[in-house]
Amino acid sequence: SAFNLNKKLIYLESGLRTNNVKDPFPEEGYRQMVSRIADINFCPTSYSASNLYSEQTKGKIHVVGNTVLDNIKKDRSDTSYGNTCLITLHRNENLNILDLWLNEIERFASNHPEIEFIFPAHPNPIILKACENLKKIKVVKPLQHRNLIDILKKCKFVITDSGGIQEEGCFLNKKIIVCRKTTERPEGIPTGHIVMCEDP
């Protein structure tokens, strides 16, 4: 819309890349297109800024950090390591195989009764259908962000396909299993926080 109206465009969270324009679809394509027309690009990390420099992006590039993480910093409650696993799965590319993911997690949960597996389920009918017969995974309604962060702070590890959870989990020093083929937030891989898991 800004481009069509010939308005200045500031792109927050710019520079995130999987470098596969169709994965995730359509987000990656939009990200690449918007950064090319943005007048100012605000990047969360130096890595995301380096993506824009390598693409010879014409707009101004600034590394400004992450406002979500800034908000978490304000909450000074302790981060602990309890016996909880937080699950978030909602991406389009996983919907067709969501039952496979959940079956594998359910099997793992059966072998680890000491861990409570919590899944705040997106209200998508496909997701709710896949949750109907789960016995070892506690399915709950979507949570407010603060409540989600409270669980994240106390959990032992995370299973997710969410980009935001990857950022927040790394910041809180959690182990994260990412149920995707690619990630636009790879900074947590070399630190050992993120483990990519392509298939159920």
Residue positions per predicted region:
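Nucleotide-activated sugar donor-binding and catalytic core shared by glycosyltransferases
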Residues: S1-F119, N124-P200
